[in-house]
Amino acid sequence: MIAKADAVVIGGGIMGASTAHFLTKLGFGEVALVEKRKICGGSTQYSAAHVRQHYSNEVGIRLAVRGASMFAHAEEELGGPAGFVQIGYMLFAPPEGEQGLRDVIPVQQGFGVETLLLTPDEVMERWPQLRLDDVALACYEPTSGFANPVLTVESLVRSAQRDGLHLYEGCEVLGISTANGRVTGVVTGDGEIATSVVVNACGPWGDRIGRMIGVDYPITFSREHEAIFDVPDGFQDFPVISDVPQCFYCRPFVGGKVLVGEGWRKQKEPVDPENYDDGTDEAHVRGMVPKLLNRIPSLAPTLRRPNYGGTFVTGYSGVYDITEDWYPIVGEEEVGGYYSCFGGSGHGFKIGPAIGESLAAAIAGQAPPIDISSLSGARFSEGKTFGSVWGPGNRA
């Protein structure tokens, strides 16, 4: 282990890997990435990995637009493949959400999102397999899609290593040293690294690291399920779907399968990130099937058989680290040189690379490509939290 670094990034998920990647790309001296498990060994590995640009606030939209561009040009921007499939993204709004959707689409278009409104009839002209009786309006983003979270993080880290990153896996952080109101080092189970910059990108463990130096935010945790089914040929032609009327999402999955999960408005399932079952529950699978059948009735002959016709392949669960307003906490804290970069609230994967790029620039004393100052944790005490056209919840 090196004795001194110009920056130490704690956490090897999408936020930490992205920040480390861009710090090394900027030539920010000696950069170390410390990960308790292995890279992408935490919540990022279980991400549904949607790449969408549908947000209500300027900073969220700008980060999502930049993120989508990065995934589309991953070899150049992220240092390697990301498994990005530009299959499009579509959101269904119920009658009570129609006006909000009409209001936010021009805002998104103004910040560069390629998105358009579609009536249910227009949607069904292209995807006639759908049933849309409860849908008032839809929006469609042709440049969005989904990616591979593990491959993305591996590409970011390997690229950073080529630029000199020091990677320490299986290395637990035990403390952060400070003096005169600034960080001076990171204490790990393998030794201490002297540094003047620490980035806390620990996801669900971010609040624990912050408390080591008195930085404490009200983060909550929720277990998030995904279920994967075999489906007939043809489903691979569908985009990623956010189904607001039914509170679920689905998208094509590799090998002729479909991934299904619980969407806005999610019911939180409190969990200990250190001790939970990372499989999925039968109750979750049972709850998703009727929603999938209601939206795509042609799946009924298979999924209505006993044991879902043998189509249930597998399921898994990750952990959301959720802030009060469902936006991440990013920026320097009162302890000089200490930067928060966690609280992704289910958005971290798609905007993580763009956050890492702007945070790295700020750390290096450069103007960030996107102004992320509004993501500072100070917003909670200053009454500057974010809202959404969809109301409270994960649909930011």
Question: Where is each model-derived feature located?
Answer:
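Helical element adjacent to the flavin cofactor pocket in flavoenzyme catalytic cores
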Residues: 139-196
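Central helical "cap/lid" subdomain
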Residues: 191-239
